[in-house]
Amino acid sequence: MSTTIPLKHTARTTTGVVPPTEKKKGSKLFALKTDFLKNDEDSIQKDILDHVEYTLARTKYNFDSFSAYQGSAYSVRDRLIERWNETQQYYTERDPKRVYYLSMEFLMGRSLQNAIYNMNLKDEYHNALLELGFEMEDLYEEEKDAALGNGGLGRLAACFMDSLATLKYPAWGYGLRYNYGMFEQGIYDGYQTEVPDYWLVAGNPWEIERLDVQYTVRFYGQVTEKKSSDGSKFEWDHGELVQAIAYDTPVPGYHTTNTNNIRLWSSKPHKEFDLDAFNGGNYLSAVEAKQRSENITSVLYPNDNTYSGKELRLKQQYFFVAATLCDVIRRFKKSHQNWQDFPNKVAIQLNDTHPTIGVVELFRKLIDEEGLQWEEAWDIVTKTFAYTNHTILPEALEMWPVSLIEDLLPRHMQLIYGINHRFLIQVTQKWPGDIGKMRGLSIIQEGEEKRVRMAHLAIVGSHCVNGVAAMHSELVKHKVFPDFFCLWPEKFQNKTNGVTPRRWIEQANPGLSAIFTKWLGTDKWTTNLELVKGIKEHMDNPELIAEWKYVKQGNKQRLAEFILKHCGIHVNPNALFDVHIKRIHEYKRQLLNILSVIYRYLSIKKMSPKDRAQVVPRVVIFAGKAAPGYVMAKRHIKLINSVAEVINRDKEVDQYLKVVFIANYNVSIAQVIVPASDINQQISTAGTEASGTSNMKFTMNGSLIIGTLDGANVEIAEEVGQENMFIFGLRTSEVEAAREKMTNKEVNIDPRLQEVFLNIELGTFGPPDVFRPILDSLIFSDFYLSIQDFPLYLDSQASVDELWKDQSAWVKKSIINSASTYFFSSDRAMNEYAEQIWDIKPCEVETTLNRRY
């Protein structure tokens, strides 16, 4: 069941194009609105002050930094909305094929700086605010990061949306408007603590609540079959109803009118308040349904260790796709009557398996609500959807109990059985009598508890499946889904990830941005990163080398001040900044890093003063969150902080080594850390990281990688040259044999690592029993092969130290890295998706209003 609830005064036309009669009725309105808002300093100042007075209801006597930020944000939003309206109207009139990017996460970071830069209003806002007594950079700090994501998946989606708007592709993102982020991380006694991240505490000036866009989403209920001369028809009714309310966030393209949209859904009760229950004295029951409905979009990734947690996660996923598909279909129906046109006008990208139930939901709507036949409906579905796989880790490939889906989404489970039945007929035609193939490929995993394999459903229901790095895509084809690849080789592609250079160079590193513009003689590199290759022509120029070092030093000084303010630790900005920032997970091997730090500490302690004089000073920086239920990862955080406490208070090594764990890592913090990094750690066990995007951000900013040949590191090595990185460790092809050796106790622990273990066991870094499970996991299992890679890792770290002593050579390698990153721009990635998966074309908005672009 789906209903649009338009307000009377905002009723929409069938096509979205205003008819001449309406224009005549509102001729005064059209006469008044013939231009965009003015962007001179006086106009901007007036708009800011008007919002402070009329939107915030504050006076000029109560005009502090936060109200200045809010007033500025609302004034920028006004300008965004103008462009947004122009863009959507233009798309409606031209009717291009659109892509809808479905993602459970959008890790947007802060929006004020991004919007001002993209709309080319940096100087105007800087000067306007300066006259009002505010530095624009200070106001950026007033904004709280939108807590709509957790890690790389959400940040990738944000970069992609930026590129789609910049490249003028007609695209919308869809997701959920979480009231709380995953959690706000603190550190207490070295342990991670978690408190709710209520990021909306002061409101969100960037979103537009769309009370005229609501859809009803159903859960539970019953399915009844009604037979007629035309055949059987299935109706899903009763159950629990929840309202989906739309919230829009405009996404500006860079120096273009084109402004796309991210539409997020918030859950509200279908029936706001049970008055009968209240009047009957049942006060808790009166609000119970309201609370249950609102829980759906309360928290990003609720803990799914319990049945109720699993149910809530699946509710989130279905609520998300059900509302989204209602919206997509409504938009399609405004100007199209023939369902065969749907795949020619709509492309839907599934960002990982979370939105996969949308495959079945579209199928259900076509069959049950639109009356299409099975084959016709399924053909439309498979031509519409495409699926991006982001992992090869088995535990990350989602599966849901059949019993849960039968209870929560009974009609969908019926359809999944039917889809699987027809799919397995294809399998038997390819491999007659091969039960093993049927069992391995089936959407439903048999066993004591039957489960639906969401990745299998996504592959079966999509016309294209892509990995996110060359190595990852090969593993997807030959290791994760080899039988699917054998069945449908034409479905599988690689689309290496990318990041936006606008945020990660121009905004995060204005000094480097200025260098590029000066030495290239143009600022066009912001939208054509291939131009940056030209900087290599000047890499031997002493002036460029001096500027490069100056900018890096300034970024390191800024990070040192940040660390002092937020961590209370003094660090030397002249030291080598060694950075490891990402989600805390065993496969990402923060453990390998901290074990090497312990060895470095023990080595320095044993050195003579003469030997210490040769030591390269280091600041080792960690940041990242562990999932609340991931006990081992949280132990790793405890070990890092315990080691940091011992090292940082040891005056004997004070000038040679510091260790910092920066809590509550987010996009804004990354924008401070990344430009200041000298080396960055990309040390996952070979064959475990799908791609990674932090490696791309660091490389763009001239930070050298120490890492394994895993994920996108492989392609970075191809672009920058392996000689300009510090590569170590087992290769993917060697991992299985290495694990076999570990299982058979054929691995000797390096004496240096034995010394590290001994010091942990002796309590050098805290009570040994706290860290005993970590040591046991290494000695008796070591699935991620830290023991075998440890000596190779130390050798690579020694190479880092040696190169650092030759600063001229170091800077040249830094320049080569930064100048070789065109392939890792999200612009390149989006062009490939558009041409090879979605079949969409740019649609540059030609506005009737005067504009500066």
UniProtKB/Swiss-Prot annotation:
A Pfam family that the UniProt record links to this protein: Phosphorylase
Cofactor: pyridoxal 5'-phosphate
Keyword field contains Phosphoprotein: yes
Residues with site note (Involved in the association of subunits): 159
Residues reported in the UniProt entry to bind AMP: 91
Family annotation (InterPro entries): Glycg_phsphrylas, Glyco_trans_35, Pyridoxal_P_attach_site
GO molecular function, one term: pyridoxal phosphate binding
GO term, biological process aspect, one: glycogen catabolic process
Phosphoserine: residues bearing it: 27, 75
Top EC class, one word: transferase
Record Gene3D superfamilies: Glycogen Phosphorylase B (3.40.50.2000)
Swiss-Prot/TrEMBL catalytic activity: [(1->4)-alpha-D-glucosyl](n) + phosphate = [(1->4)-alpha-D-glucosyl](n-1) + alpha-D-glucose 1-phosphate
PROSITE patterns on file: PHOSPHORYLASE (PS00102)
Residues under site feature: May be involved in allosteric control: 174
Enzyme Commission designation: 2.4.1.1
Post-translational modification N6-(pyridoxal phosphate)lysine, affected residues: 697
Signal peptide limits: none
GO CC, alphabetical: cytoplasm
Activity regulation (UniProt): During logarithmic growth and early developmental phases, the activity of GP1 is dependent on 5'AMP. It then seems to convert to an AMP independent type. This alteration in activity coincides with phosphorylation of GP1.
Keywords: Allosteric enzyme, Carbohydrate metabolism, Glycogen metabolism, Glycosyltransferase, Nucleotide-binding, Phosphoprotein, Pyridoxal phosphate, Transferase
Family according to the record: Belongs to the glycogen phosphorylase family.
Note: In D.discoideum glycogen phosphorylase exists as 2 developmentally regulated forms, GP1 and GP2, which are the products of separate genes.
NCBIfam families to which the protein is assigned, alphabetical: P_ylase
Role played: May provide energy to overcome environmental stresses.
Protein name: Glycogen phosphorylase 1
Organism: Dictyostelium discoideum (Social amoeba)
Gene this protein is translated from: glpV
